[in-house]
Every structure is written in C-alpha cells, then in structure tokens.
Amino acid sequence: PLLEGPAEKIGHHLKFDLEVLRANGIHVKGPFFDTLLAHALIAPGMKHGMDVLAENLLQYSTIKLKDIAAPGAKKRELDTSGVPVEVMGKYSAEDADITLQLSAVLKRQVKESGMEKLFRTVELPLLPVLADMEFSGIRVLPESLEKASVKVGAIIDGLRERIEEAAGHPLNLNSPKQLGDFLFGELELVKKPKKTKTGQFVTDEDTLSALAPQHPIVADILAYRENMKLKSTYLDALPRYICPRDGRIHTQFHQMLTATGRLASQD
C-alpha cells in the first residue's frame, strides 16, 4: 500500500527499481523523483553514478558494491548471492540514505537551473512510461528475421559480385584500407584525398556519398555497407536478445543519454 500511495518515491535510476518491483507483483505509483535523471538534466557532461554524486555533492565516500560482491558470470556484472545479510543490509541502508540526501541537494539545483518545469512535466512523467515499455518488451518473430536475413544476404552477395566485376579483381569491402587504396590509389577519384592519422585514406559515409556521382561503383559500395549493417546489426543480432520466457526483446531505453534529447536503446 505504501508504494502504491500518494507519497513521493525517490530513487537513483528509479526505472530499474520500478521494473524489479513490478516483476514481483508490486506496481509503484507516483509521484517520483529520480536523482540520476535530475543530475543528468543539469549536468549532462558529467558522470551520474551514486558513488560519484555522493563524493561531489555530499563529500561522502560510499560503500562500493565491487568491494563486497564477487565477479558475475558476465563482464561488468557482480554477484551478491554470497554477501552476508548484515553486510548487504548496511550497503542497502546506506544506498537509501544517500539517495534521500542527494534528492534534497538536486531538487534545489534543478530549481536553480530553471529546468524544474521540464523535469516535472517531461522527464519524470516519461520514466514510468519507459519502465512499462521495457517490462512489456517488443514482440519479435525469429522466422521473419531469418527470412529477411537470407534475402538481404543475397543482395549483399550480388553487390559484392558486381563491385568486384567492375573493379576487375577481388576486393575486401570490409577493409577500409583496401577500399581506400582502390578508390583513391587505383581509381584516383580525388586528387588530394583525406587521410586518417595512421595514413589510411578516409572512406566514411560522408566521403563516399560525396563521390557517388563520380563513379557508379561508389554507390554500390554504399549500398553494400548499408545492407551489411542491416544484416549484422539487426537481422542476425536481434534473435540473440529474445527472452525465452515470453518471446520478446526487453531493451533498455535511456532518456538522458543523447545530447539531442532523443531516446537511446541498449541491449
């Protein structure tokens, strides 16, 4: 009843807490205050971890989870299953105390920054919406991805054959060095091409897009890259993220990760 009542709920990365509680049948209702979001709004270029904020804003050194937990199965994961209850209890109590202290400081700073209206009317209301989206997940049909991957793979093979036929010899299109040597050394599309600090020719998308009108092979190379990215980043990768429990992908949405304000998706 307390978590579903009208009292303000304060947390650091509160979205994570909402999802954990919801997975255990507890639906937390607002109002909310997230110290991580507050600091990210007023100081976007700085680190927003609780340990850092405690040092900078409270002049307090917190208990570090890495000092009491064991390494997890995955990189950057920590396993707390073997931590004694009294040790974990002290860590958790400090976590709650520091979050409350940080909220008092950050509420004042958000107000002084002139961004309180933005924070209260846009960022905080968005938080539970994103938590719901992450918890619900995105339905994905693996068989559809597999069919699309085969189709795009055929397009990639066709583009590779056409490019190598036009070049007159085999060409590793995934090697920026080979590609640069071919376009600027062999074809000499530009008299004074740009080079990287290591001396290689620059072959990024902007450079090739500007050269596309000069030679049809450049347009094919751009199309090859676009389809390769589609296949490797999405069609072949997404099935690995499907949760076996419900057949959905549960990503993480970040509302403060980009300077432009757009949502960023991770995992």
How would you name each of these model-derived features?
Residues 7-8, 62, 226:
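Generic structural signal for secondary-structure transition and capping sites
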Residues 27-43:
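Conserved beta-strand -> loop -> alpha-helix junction used to position metal-binding or nucleic-acid-contacting
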Residues 11-12, 30-34, 64, 173, ...:
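General beta-strand structural signal in soluble alpha/beta enzymes
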Residues 1-31, 99:
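RNA/tRNA-interacting regions in translation and RNA-turnover enzymes
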Residues 2-4, 35-37, 114-115, 145:
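A short, structure-level motif marking secondary-structure boundaries and short turns
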